[in-house]
């Protein structure tokens, strides 16, 4: 096996040699030192991935049955090209052919998918020592959030950190957040004027950062947000990429350098805000103060570095959900003008004909808007795939998954399986008023995860999105441009819309 593996690696190096040589000539202008550095990085990356692949070859116990394996004639890369081009189609076709559990190889790693509610239960009910999250996500999140938080610490410590954050995401804070988000939204859209065409995903991504920073980080951090800091957040967010997931973090890639620089500069902003708050006699009831007052079970308080890392993680983890969901919902409403008008009229019915400032209690009663968000999350969940690393053999549907497999669930596939959802591809917010096969399935709808792994920011995300879209519907009418509805951009790690430009017109008062 080692000899065959060595030949495979040699073949990869030979196959990539001519392409790499041509690319290096263009990038380096023929500079010998630069070419050598790039060649070394390329070779080390292949060796790194190859070692991961070989390390995952584990024998099953006697008599155990492996999941159906989708063969690929392409060594090492496996199904990476087909999957990368159209991942949902790939998974749905595999489900039809092989059933709810199957395996395949990409970039030297073996992935086992659990599709449908029954199979997905294995992942969502698992213990971290069996299906491990850090083994999958640490190299992606640690350079972004920092060391000592999230997936860089043992799971019991991470659970304590999540509990601290969750204690700050409470109804008392949400009631404060509604007016903050409404004010930020009105101020942001002042520059849009009476009518026009705008990239709504870019706009909402910026607005989500502004509102989340104000609500979650406190006024000290929000006061420092400007175009430069917004770009730092964008560079930091760029760390969530396929390259960061697949390649070692020490490679001198431009996106890695931007990510690391942004991390240092944003941390400095947080350090100053934390010190200012610690020195202040004023006690402000917000999440920053919650973390400054929090202690671990052993009585140890959080360090400034831990507080900063947790705040960065809280913002960026939620930013993806809220910005992507908000943008997609805008296009669903623009495509269905009748539904859009119903959502606008609901504002008047619930809040009053003169549309006074929003309150948290009113927000809870906007049931149609709530169902629109829920249906958007069904068809366009921000996270396409949730993963864990198998550390122990796992049995599901009569198959045994060996240690070393990356075990995956796809919310996107689960939330549009024809066995679970009637008219599964239609955007129909009223489906939640009716009986659905999915309503009896525990893991048919999982945009925020489930079980031990459910997202702690779900309630804040709903408050944020509902407040932003309530304000936007009061300000504007939205239309598609020449009937264009965006396709999904699968080159990113979230379901972003392609060319997300929308037409708007201010409502007459």
UniProtKB/Swiss-Prot annotation:
Protein name: Lanosterol 14-alpha demethylase
Catalytic activity line of the entry: a 14alpha-methyl steroid + 3 reduced [NADPH--hemoprotein reductase] + 3 O2 = a Delta(14) steroid + formate + 3 oxidized [NADPH--hemoprotein reductase] + 4 H2O + 4 H(+); lanosterol + 3 reduced [NADPH--hemoprotein reductase] + 3 O2 = 4,4-dimethyl-5alpha-cholesta-8,14,24-trien-3beta-ol + formate + 3 oxidized [NADPH--hemoprotein reductase] + 4 H2O + 4 H(+); 24,25-dihydrolanosterol + 3 reduced [NADPH--hemoprotein reductase] + 3 O2 = 4,4-dimethyl-8,14-cholestadien-3beta-ol + formate + 3 oxidized [NADPH--hemoprotein reductase] + 4 H2O + 4 H(+); a 14alpha-methyl steroid + reduced [NADPH--hemoprotein reductase] + O2 = a 14alpha-hydroxymethyl steroid + oxidized [NADPH--hemoprotein reductase] + H2O + H(+)
GO molecular function: heme binding; iron ion binding; sterol 14-demethylase activity
Class of enzymatic activity (EC top level): oxidoreductase
Keywords: Cholesterol biosynthesis, Cholesterol metabolism, Endoplasmic reticulum, Heme, Iron, Lipid biosynthesis, Lipid metabolism, Membrane, Metal-binding, Microsome, Monooxygenase, Oxidoreductase, Steroid biosynthesis, Steroid metabolism, Sterol biosynthesis, Sterol metabolism, Transmembrane, Transmembrane helix, Ubl conjugation
Membrane-protein topology: Single-pass membrane protein
Regulation affecting activity: Inhibited by azalanstat. Inhibited by azole antifungal agents ketoconazole, itraconazole and fluconazole.
Binding site for heme: 455
Cellular component GO terms held in the UniProt record: endoplasmic reticulum membrane
Domain of life: Eukaryota
Pathway named in the protein's UniProt entry: Steroid biosynthesis; zymosterol biosynthesis; zymosterol from lanosterol: step 1/6
Native source species: Pongo abelii
Transmembrane segments: 30-50
Function per UniProt: Sterol 14alpha-demethylase that plays a critical role in the cholesterol biosynthesis pathway, being cholesterol the major sterol component in mammalian membranes as well as a precursor for bile acid and steroid hormone synthesis.
EC number: 1.14.14.154
Cellular compartments annotated: Endoplasmic reticulum membrane; Microsome membrane
Cofactor(s) needed for function: heme
Family affiliation: Belongs to the cytochrome P450 family.
GO process annotations (BP): cholesterol biosynthetic process
PROSITE patterns: CYTOCHROME_P450
PTM: Ubiquitinated by MARCHF6, leading to proteasomal degradation.
UniProt xrefs under PANTHER family: 24-HYDROXYCHOLESTEROL 7-ALPHA-HYDROXYLASE (PTHR24304:SF2), CYTOCHROME P450 FAMILY 7 (PTHR24304)
Main location: endoplasmic reticulum
């Amino acid at each position: 096996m080692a000899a065959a593996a060595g030949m495979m690696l040699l073949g990869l190096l030979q196959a990539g040699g001519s392409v790499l040589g041509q690319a290096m000539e263009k990038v380096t202008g023929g500079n010998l030192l630069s070419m050598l550095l790039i060649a070394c990085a390329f070779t080390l990356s292949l060796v790194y991935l190859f070692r991961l692949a070989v390390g995952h070859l584990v024998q099953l116990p006697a008599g155990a049955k492996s999941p159906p394996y989708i063969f690929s004639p392409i060594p090492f890369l496996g199904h990476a090209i087909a999957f990368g081009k159209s991942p949902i189609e790939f998974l749905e076709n595999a489900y039809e052919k092989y059933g709810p559990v199957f395996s395949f190889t990409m970039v030297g790693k073996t992935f086992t998918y659990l599709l449908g509610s029954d199979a997905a239960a294995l992942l969502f009910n698992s213990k971290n020592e069996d299906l491990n999250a850090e083994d999958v996500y640490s190299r992606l999140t640690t350079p972004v959030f920092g060391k000592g938080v999230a997936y860089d610490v043992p799971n019991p410590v991470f659970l304590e950190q999540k509990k601290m954050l969750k204690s700050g995401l409470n109804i008392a804070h949400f009631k404060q957040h509604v007016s903050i988000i409404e004010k930020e939204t009105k101020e942001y859209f002042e520059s849009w004027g009476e009518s026009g065409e705008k990239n709504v995903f870019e706009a909402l991504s910026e607005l989500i950062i502004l509102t989340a920073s104000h609500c979650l980080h406190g006024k000290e951090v929000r006061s420092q947000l400007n175009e430069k800091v917004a770009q730092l957040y964008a560079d930091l967010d760029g760390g969530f990429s396929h390259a960061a997931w697949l390649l070692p973090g020490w490679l001198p890639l431009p996106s890695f350098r931007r990510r690391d620089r942004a991390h240092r500069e944003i941390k400095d902003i947080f350090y100053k805000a934390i010190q200012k708050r610690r020195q202040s006699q004023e006690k402000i009831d917000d999440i920053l103060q919650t973390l400054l007052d929090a202690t671990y079970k052993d009585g140890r308080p959080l360090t400034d570095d831990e507080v900063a890392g947790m705040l960065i993680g809280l913002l960026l983890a939620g930013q993806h959900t809220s910005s992507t969901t908000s943008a997609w919902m805008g296009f669903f409403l623009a495509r269905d003008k009748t539904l859009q008008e119903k959502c606008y009229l609901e504002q008047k019915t619930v809040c009053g004909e003169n549309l006074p400032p929003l309150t948290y209690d009113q927000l809870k009663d906007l049931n149609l808007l709530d169902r629109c968000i829920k249906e958007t999350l069904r068809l366009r969940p921000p996270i396409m795939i949730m993963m864990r690393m198998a550390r122990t053999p796992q049995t599901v549907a009569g198959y045994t998954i060996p240690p070393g497999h990356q075990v995956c669930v796809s919310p996107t596939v689960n939330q549009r399986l024809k066995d679970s959802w009637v008219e599964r591809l239609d955007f129909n917010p009223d489906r939640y008023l009716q009986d659905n096969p999915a309503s009896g399935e525990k893991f048919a709808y999982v945009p925020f995860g489930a079980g031990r792994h459910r997202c702690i920011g779900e309630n804040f995300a709903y408050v944020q999105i509902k407040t932003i879209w309530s304000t936007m519907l009061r300000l504007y009418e939205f239309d598609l441009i020449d009937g264009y509805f965006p396709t999904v951009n699968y080159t990113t790690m979230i379901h972003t819309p392609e060319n997300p430009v929308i037409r708007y017109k201010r409502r007459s008062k």
